[in-house]
């Protein structure tokens, strides 16, 4: 049952990116990214990454909603173009959806393509050794490693996001 849920989420994930790539208006492109980001967080949650899924959902989608809200407020069209208004855009959208549905049909009919998620040899990536101290949450150890070894990474990431918002605001400000 869980495999089918992940499979359906993966199809919605790809459909969101198809909608983004064939966007006729920036409003619908942002909507496709938001849908794909939310569904991607659901896929991460399904594989046990509850903290990572929640943080990506809150930070990525929250920040993207703020930037998307500002940019669409400054560059809104009076009559936005939809997928059905242009034949080339509609053709790209339908082609992407058909390719996705053919892939789904192929996987479900023949079952020759298998989903493999096996991670062997990840012991080289372990920073903290828990030893014989019992059960530890992998997410808590990852967050501890991020803030102890990755302090500069957190600072550079936060600064990059701030500069990205400022650049987008300057570009969309107009004349």
From Swiss-Prot:
Its EC number is 7.1.1.2. The chain crosses the membrane at residues 1-21, 25-45, 47-67, 88-108, 149-169. Keywords: Electron transport, Membrane, Mitochondrion, Mitochondrion inner membrane, NAD, Respiratory chain, Translocase, Transmembrane, Transmembrane helix, Transport, Ubiquinone. GO terms for molecular function: NADH dehydrogenase (ubiquinone) activity. One of its GO terms (biological process) is mitochondrial electron transport, NADH to ubiquinone. Pfam families: Oxidored_q3. GO terms for cellular component: mitochondrial inner membrane; mitochondrion; respiratory chain complex I. InterPro entries: ComplexI_Subunit6, NADH_UbQ/plastoQ_OxRdtase_su6, Nuo/plastoQ_OxRdtase_6_NuoJ. It is an enzyme of class 7 (translocase). Gene3D superfamilies: NADH-ubiquinone/plastoquinone oxidoreductase chain 6, subunit NuoJ. It is a multi-pass membrane protein. It catalyses: a ubiquinone + NADH + 5 H(+)(in) = a ubiquinol + NAD(+) + 4 H(+)(out). It is found in: Mitochondrion inner membrane. Belongs to the complex I subunit 6 family. Core subunit of respiratory chain NADH dehydrogenase (Complex I) which is composed of 45 different subunits. Core subunit of the mitochondrial membrane respiratory chain NADH dehydrogenase (Complex I) which catalyzes electron transfer from NADH through the respiratory chain, using ubiquinone as an electron acceptor. Essential for the catalytic activity and assembly of complex I. PANTHER family: NADH UBIQUINONE OXIDOREDUCTASE SUBUNIT ND6, NADH-UBIQUINONE OXIDOREDUCTASE CHAIN 6. This is NADH-ubiquinone oxidoreductase chain 6. It comes from Bos taurus (Bovine).
């Amino acid at each position: 049952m869980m495999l089918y849920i992940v499979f359906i989420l993966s199809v919605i994930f790809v459909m969101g990116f198809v909608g983004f790539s064939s966007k006729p208006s920036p409003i619908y492109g942002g909507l496709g990214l938001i849908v794909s980001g939310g569904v991607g967080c659901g896929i991460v949650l399904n594989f046990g990454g509850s903290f990572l899924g929640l943080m990506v959902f809150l930070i990525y989608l929250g920040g993207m909603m703020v930037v998307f809200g500002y940019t669409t407020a400054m560059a809104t069209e009076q009559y936005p173009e939809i997928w059905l208004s242009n034949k080339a855009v509609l053709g790209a959208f339908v082609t992407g959806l058909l390719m996705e549905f053919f892939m789904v049909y192929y996987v479900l009919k023949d079952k020759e393509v298998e989903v493999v998620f096996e991670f062997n040899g990840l012991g080289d990536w372990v920073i903290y050794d828990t030893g014989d101290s019992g059960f530890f949450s992998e997410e808590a150890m990852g967050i501890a490693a991020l803030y102890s070894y990755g302090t500069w990474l957190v600072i550079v990431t936060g600064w990059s996001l701030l500069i990205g918002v400022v650049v987008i605001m300057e570009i969309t400000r107009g004349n």
